[in-house]
């Protein structure tokens, strides 16, 4: 996080020299940075703000000496995957294991502080959320008689299943044919259900999961058991997302929104693994701010 602030926090556009090869090919120019390709190991430090290379797959001839020389001269050398993460908020799944996408060990301070904030914020919000939940339950029951709560087995931290609670937003027979993704115009969703899904009100009962320690306010969204089995087989590194406690909201939710198929889930995973790799109180605060914007706009809901 702080590296990205130092590199891209200034007003001037950063100019980076790119050594060809490996994941450096995935870099694209933005309003914050431009790249100059170098097919030969000659770089003038005054012309660029740093050097970018795939340190695991770099041309041998001359380039290692070039990086060492410029590093000693004070010119920063960045791994191409780091620059990609800074600019996109995602990790490159193809190199996730090599670059430790499972993240660094969480410090006791972060774990305890986050857990304390989870409990404190849930309890502090009850005077507002309890009346809202009662009204929501009444609206669901009036429109579609039946259980107002929906409990579904999801996969949590360490791959352990737990019963996640939501307000029921679909017909009572919505999953008679098994688990399936929700479409944008899904006929199974009730009118009240569409409203509470748009503004994420259906997630409020998960405060109970948070108090029990099964979930956090912030983390990768817990997925259904059948989908986890499918994605573990189809998507490389998918299991890494279970190395932290799942959340009611998360980096993937505010940056990518709902995923309705395997391709979208793969893209969403790249955001989840970014959070796993970089989770911190600062990133959590940013996610809270973006979640408020998401709720107000209804971004990514289905």
Predicted features by range, described:
Residues 2-130:
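N-terminal hydrophobic signal-anchor/signal peptide
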Residues 14-34, 147-170, 190, 195:
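Membrane-cytosol interface motif
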Residues 84, 90-91, 150-188, 249-268:
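Short, glycine-rich, amphipathic interfacial segments at transmembrane boundaries or analogous
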Residues 96-103, 120, 175-177, 186-191, ...:
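Bateman (tandem CBS) regulatory domains
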Residues 110-175, 209, 281, 286-302:
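A hydrophobic, helix-centered structural microdomain
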């Amino acid at each position: 996080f702080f590296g990205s602030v130092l590199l891209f926090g200034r007003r001037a556009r950063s100019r980076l020299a790119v050594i060809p090869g490996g994941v450096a090919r995935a870099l694209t120019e933005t309003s914050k940075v431009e790249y100059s390709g170098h097919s030969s190991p000659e770089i003038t430090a005054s012309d660029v703000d740093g050097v970018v290379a795939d340190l695991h797959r770099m041309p041998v001839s001359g380039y290692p000496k070039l990086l060492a020389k410029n590093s000693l001269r004070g010119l920063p050398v960045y791994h191409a995957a780091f620059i990609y993460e800074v600019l996109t908020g995602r990790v490159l799944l193809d190199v996730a294991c090599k670059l430790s996408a499972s993240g660094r060990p969480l410090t006791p301070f972060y774990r305890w502080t986050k857990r304390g904030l989870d409990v404190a914020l849930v309890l502090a919000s009850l005077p507002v959320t309890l009346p809202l939940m009662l009204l929501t339950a009444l609206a669901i029951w009036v429109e579609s008689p039946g259980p107002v709560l929906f409990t579904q087995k999801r996969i949590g931290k360490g791959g352990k299943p737990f019963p996640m609670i939501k307000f029921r937003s679909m017909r009572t027979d919505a999953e008679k044919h098994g688990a399936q993704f929700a479409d944008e115009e899904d006929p199974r969703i009730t009118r009240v259900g569409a409203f509470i899904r748009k503004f994420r009100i259906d997630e409020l009962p998960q405060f109970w999961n948070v108090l029990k320690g099964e979930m956090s306010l912030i983390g990768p969204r817990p997925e259904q058991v059948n989908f986890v089995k499918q994605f573990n087989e189809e998507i490389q590194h998918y299991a890494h997302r279970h190395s932290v406690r799942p959340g009611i909201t998360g980096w993937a939710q505010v940056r990518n929104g709902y995923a309705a198929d395997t391709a979208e889930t793969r893209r969403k995973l790249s955001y989840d693994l970014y959070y796993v790799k970089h989770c911190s109180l600062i990133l959590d605060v940013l996610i809270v701010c973006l979640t408020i914007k998401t709720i107000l706009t209804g971004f990514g809901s289905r």
